[in-house]
Amino acid sequence: MDQNKQKALAAALGQIEKQFGKGSIMRLGDSKTMDIEAISTGSLSLDVALGIGGLPCGRIVEIYGPESSGKTTLTLQVIAEAQKKGKVCAFIDAEHALDPIYAAKLGVNVDDLLISQPDTGEQALEICDMLVRSNAVDVIIVDSVAALTPKAEIEGEMGDSHVGLQARLMSQALRKLTANIKNANCLCIFINQIRMKIGVMFGSPETTTGGNALKFYASVRLDIRRIGAIKEGDEVVGNETRVKVVKNKVAPPFKQAEFQIFYGVGISKEGELVDLGVKHKLIDKAGAWYSYNGEKIGQGKANVMKLFTENKVMAAEVEARLRELLLSGDVPAEKPVVADADELEAESEQEFE
């Protein structure tokens, strides 16, 4: 760039900063804009799948899935992890269904958690906006979008038609919220439910409530599903859960994480440490025996999990090593699903020979 253009650009940038404030325009390579702070989800495998070690601050996140799939449990684990870092968290309970006893069991400090149970969708989103603009709240959960009932619908008759009212409400609210959330560096998580579209012949009939606005404004979208039951004898004690990163603006998307959620306990961190440790050769497995640093640590996965529960120092060491390995980008990439054109050509030639 020649000197005249550089001077003109510098003058324009100076004028913009003077008129609109410092930071209103900057170069993308500036370190302040590049680094994204993340809050752990409480699941190591999900943190790795998200690519940055957790959910991004200053962004909108959507978590959706069928009933009893673990949506609220996952958000409560995020609150517990955020509170460990000294962050202030708020829970906007539009469903009026939050159980404080269950939240406490998952590690949430219920004494410090801000909770609101609003009457209307407008009230819920206005409270959310005021909390964000205060710059004092770090994590806000809205549970759920489907329960954000517009005031007109509440005041109207039961059979009245209110086409697109909730979608318009969400669209307007997100236009206001997005910039404020970024400026406050606040993590805002919307929990959403699934509905079925009628008459869909091809593709998935599933859709989320509240229109399309949230799909666009969300930086991360997580699809959480229950894929199996965990049993002790005949008694079901938990769920096998799979989370798919459907959208990710801060790292490569479409990665998956699988973990166990035990009733009354939450996400099994110890089980993840064992599985990921074996997968990435930090823990050696010979038959039913597991070894760490050359020493046997237990026979059977359940015994190793019990050891990690009791020995917090060893568990923290294994987790730190796994995070360093998996989030540094040194893990060898898996072979892509789509084959090269040369490979496909070679295979077709072999078939014809």
UniProtKB/Swiss-Prot annotation:
Ranges in coiled-coil conformation: none
Superkingdom of origin organism: Bacteria
Amino-acid positions noted as binding ATP in the UniProt annotation, renumbered to this chain: G65, P66, E67, S68, S69, G70, K71, T72
Cited SUPFAM superfamilies: P-loop containing nucleoside triphosphate hydrolases (SSF52540), RecA protein, C-terminal domain (SSF54752)
Gene3D superfamilies to which the protein is assigned, alphabetical: P-loop containing nucleotide triphosphate hydrolases
GO terms (BP aspect): DNA recombination; DNA repair; SOS response
GO molecular function, one term: single-stranded DNA binding
Alphabetic keyword roster: ATP-binding, Cytoplasm, DNA damage, DNA recombination, DNA repair, DNA-binding, Nucleotide-binding, SOS response
InterPro entries noted in UniProt: AAA+_ATPase, DNA_recomb/repair_RecA, DNA_recomb/repair_RecA_CS, P-loop_NTPase, RecA-like_C, RecA-like_N, RecA_ATP-bd, RecA_C_sf
SMART domains: AAA
Compartments (UniProt record): Cytoplasm
Cytoplasm among keywords: yes
GO cellular component: cytosol
Keyword Mitochondrion: no
Pfam families in alphabetical order: RecA, RecA_C
UniProt-listed PANTHER family: MITOCHONDRIAL DNA REPAIR PROTEIN RECA HOMOLOG-RELATED, RECA
Function: Can catalyze the hydrolysis of ATP in the presence of single-stranded DNA, the ATP-dependent uptake of single-stranded DNA by duplex DNA, and the ATP-dependent hybridization of homologous single-stranded DNAs. It interacts with LexA causing its activation and leading to its autocatalytic cleavage.
Stated family: Belongs to the RecA family.
Identification of the protein by name: Protein RecA
Designated gene of the protein: recA
